[in-house]
Regions:
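Hydrophobic h-region of N-terminal signal peptides that target proteins for export
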Residues: 9-17
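Flexible loop/hinge segments at secondary-structure junctions
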Residues: 19-345
């Protein structure tokens, strides 16, 4: 699967992945094919009485259109509510919450340790992460799903998370005790059996490596010896040029025709899934991504009413429709939407 998408870049690559975050709003150009719909079982937002107040937020520069739509819809219902949002980039969510200068951070990736640790040191608990949108399938710089790729001549077609963990980690939190260092250990035979695996990735910390560490390595430690690049941009070419290479990357950045995307399964025995639009939109593909609103909520304490209702609106039928109308990110599946809404109670 190869997807090449032109992008109107405003002074930066990778706003959602931890690099060069002080940028204007970013939009893909030209408009992209899109086929997502909102699950009809997601509830329509029902207003509460007498809501007034103000909120201040910070957002990634890739989500501004969605935020604007949410604010417009919400303040039409509640004219006595004022919401202002700074485009500070995903990397500003943690620091602004820690400093108390933002009520929420709309962040287009997971929060990195260097962003979360000062918050935990100050408050004694982690920021509450509420998923409010799916990522994109393969839009450059817009929280694209993550894939593992190999050279097109490699006969391997699929791989499990425990196998990837044994290739990339020193801790092996997913249960395979010994490192996987040759292609034969993944079941390849003949000339491939004793050939070394050349593992590639991104220099840490970065939004891509943070996601892979959390979801594939089960928060383990990276092993020594992984070859890396400063961004994911060259990784497709690196794998295309090396018959024995493997790398994770964003699907949008896998542009070299001489690579192949592997199907993934979280556990042995699970079905192996490819990153099709349907699998990503329904969050079935194991490395589909989501976009979060982070807030400072002390465990056991209620959320500010205006903030609670704003997030509830984002998770409502109206809020998810705004995501579809933007035609970049995917709305949440109903079950995930319901789980995230429960966090507001």
């Amino acid at each position: 699967m190869k997807t090449t998408i032109a992008l109107l870049l405003v002074a930066v690559w990778f706003p959602a992945n931890g690099q060069n975050l002080e940028t204007p709003a970013l939009r893909p150009d030209p408009p992209l094919p899109y086929g997502a719909t909102v699950d009809s079982s997601i509830p329509v937002y029902k207003p509460v009485k007498g809501l007034s107040g103000s909120l201040k937020g910070v957002e990634s520069n890739t989500v501004t259109a969605v935020t604007d739509a949410w604010i417009a819809g919400f303040t039409k219902i509640y004219p006595d509510v004022k919401i202002s949002v700074d485009i500070g980039g995903s990397g500003q969510g943690g620091p602004r919450l820690t400093a108390g200068t933002a009520d929420f951070g709309f962040i287009a990736r997971e929060m990195m340790g260097r962003e979360e640790t000062p918050f935990v040191d100050k408050f004694g608990y982690k920021p509450l992460a509420i998923a409010v949108s799916g990522g994109s399938l393969a839009v450059k710089a817009f929280t694209d799903c993550i894939v593992f790729i190999v050279n097109k001549d490699n006969p391997l077609e699929e791989v499990t998370f425990p196998q990837l963990d044994a290739i990339y980690s020193a801790t092996h939190n997913r249960g395979i005790k010994n490192p996987i260092a040759t292609w034969g250990q993944l079941g390849l035979t003949g000339e491939w059996a004793d050939k070394p695996i050349h593992a590639w990735g991104v220099e840490i910390p970065n939004g891509y490596d943070t996601f892979v560490n959390m979801h594939v390595l089960a928060n383990g430690q990276w092993r020594e010896g992984i070859q890396s690049q400063h961004t994911v941009i060259p990784l497709s070419d690196k794998v295309a040029a090396d018959k024995y290479a493997i790398s994770y990357t964003g699907l949008a950045w896998d542009t070299n025709p001489n690579t192949k995307v592997l199907k993934l399964a979280v556990h042995p025995g699970d079905p192996f899934l490819a990153p099709t639009f349907e699998n990503v939109a329904l969050q079935k593909y194991p490395l589909s991504r989501v976009i979060y609103i982070f807030i400072n909520r002390e465990p056991g304490k209620p959320i500010n009413a205006v903030l609670r209702e704003f997030i509830r609106y984002a998770l409502s039928q109206q809020g998810q429709q705004a995501i579809v109308q933007d035609r970049i990110f995917t709305p949440l599946p109903a079950a995930l939407d319901a789980r995230e809404t429960e966090k507001l109670k």
